[in-house]
Regions:
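Oxyanion-binding "anion nests"
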Residues: 283-295
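Leucine-rich repeat
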Residues: 2-209
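A structural signal for leucine-rich repeat
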Residues: 106-110, 131-140, 158-166, 182-190, ...
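Extracellular beta-strand scaffolds
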Residues: 116, 153-155, 177, 198, ...
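Amphipathic alpha-helical scaffolding segments
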Residues: 71, 261-264, 285
Length: 295
């Protein structure tokens, strides 16, 4: 009889998880896919709106197996419409397949104040997700960090300043519709301080015009094991630059203006294409310089 009573007590014991503070519930739900976090709204009245207030959302196409007949972009758009948190610290999209509707199905449905936005595409290299940044969307006004990685092709249209708060921009293996798209993207970031640009894919001859008066840290790298002859030309106008990191065996680099605030530089380039570069770096306090000879 005692065992039976004990069993009844166990079944009817209070729901301790539901009694946890919201901050802890947010941390727990942030560890699982958004689709699973949304399913917790069926547990009880207490859980109905918990997921809607999450400060961090991660959409991974590989883990969204319970979204029914909706496509991944449709699911993201609809769930973002339901999200109610006034502040969204981080939004991450991890794509597996090609999608060209991010700018129409997802961007307009972000209603929270967004601080960090990350898009990663892991699909086949021959399939690029084209992203066109639309005109003056409010979601981009508060963005502080933007990270784009993988098989993404950026097409930046003419628009008013749309990243007026962006401080850090990470572009890893990202292609551009044309050279103007890259320039337009930077011109839309009037307070940009950190630029990380990594090339893993062959884009042929490409001019990267970096003219950002507010830029303080610039990193441009090409993966060490990648030795193709596709040539990048970087024209840099960054009078506020303090930290510089460059590694590219075939690239050509030129500095349009002096950089009087530069205190640290790590440069690994081919000497024959960058003979004037050492003179630009003579006043740097901390310098690491590797000049590769012509082959």
């Amino acid at each position: 009889m005692e065992a039976a009573r004990s069993g009844i007590e166990d079944v009817t014991s209070p729901d301790r998880i539901s009694q946890l503070p919201n901050d802890l519930l947010f941390r727990i739900l942030s560890l699982i896919p958004v689709s699973d976090a949304m399913s917790t709204s069926l547990l009880s009245k207490r859980w109905k709106s918990v997921w809607k207030m999450l400060p961090t959302l991660v959409y991974n196409e590989n883990s969204c197996s319970n979204i029914g007949s909706l496509g991944f972009d449709q699911f993201c758009g609809r769930s973002l419409q339901l999200h109610e948190a006034p502040l969204l610290k981080t939004l991450t999209l991890e794509l597996r397949k090609q999608t060209d509707s991010l700018d129409s199905s997802i961007f307009p449905n972000i209603h929270s104040t967004l601080l960090e936005f990350s898009i990663k595409s892991t699909g086949y290299p021959v399939y690029y997700s084209t992203i066109s940044f639309p005109n003056n969307l409010d979601v981009f006004q508060t963005l502080v960090v933007l990270k784009l990685q993988g098989n993404i092709c950026l097409d930046v249209v003419d628009s008013p300043v749309c990243f007026q708060s962006l401080k850090s921009l990470y572009l890893t293996c990202v292609n551009f519709e044309n050279e103007e798209s890259f320039s337009k993207l930077l011109s839309a970031c009037p307070v940009l301080e950190d630029l990380f640009l990594q090339r893993l894919c062959s884009v042929g001859r490409f001019l990267f015009s970096i003219s950002v008066p507010s830029l303080q840290r610039l990193t441009y790298t090409k993966e060490q094991a990648y030795y193709s002859n596709d040539e990048a030309i970087l024209e840099i106008t960054a009078p506020s630059l303090k930290h510089l990191n460059i590694f590219d065996r075939v690239g050509v680099f030129s500095f349009i203006e002096d950089m009087p605030k530069l205190v640290e530089a790590s440069v690994r380039v081919k000497l024959s294409k960058n003979e004037k570069l050492p003179k630009v770096l003579t006043s740097v306090e901390h310098l690491s310089l590797d000049l590769y000879p012509s082959m």
